[in-house]
A protein has these predicted regions:
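Ubiquitin-like/PB1-type beta-grasp interaction modules and other compact soluble beta-rich domains
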Residues: 1-70
Length: 70
């Protein structure tokens, strides 16, 4: 499956589609419990990760929000 991940081409070998949770695992995303996922321009609710299928040609962004400063 060929995707665009964080603006760069990416391939997940041997898969035609995955749910978002499986994609996080397949791509070895760091701290998956803290990542926000944008799929094809839409921010996803974490509760939808299992039921949402990522398909060939999709665009995925992994976003991390961090606090800090004064």
């Amino acid at each position: 499956m060929n995707l665009t991940v964080n603006g760069k081409p990416a391939t997940v070998d041997g898969e035609k589609s995955l749910n978002v949770t499986a994609l996080l695992t397949a791509l070895k995303v760091e701290q998956p419990d803290y990542v926000t996922v944008e799929l094809n321009g839409d921010i996803m609710d974490r509760g939808d990760f299992e039921a949402t299928t990522v398909k060939d040609g999709d665009t995925v962004e992994f976003l991390y929000f961090m606090g800090g400063g004064k």
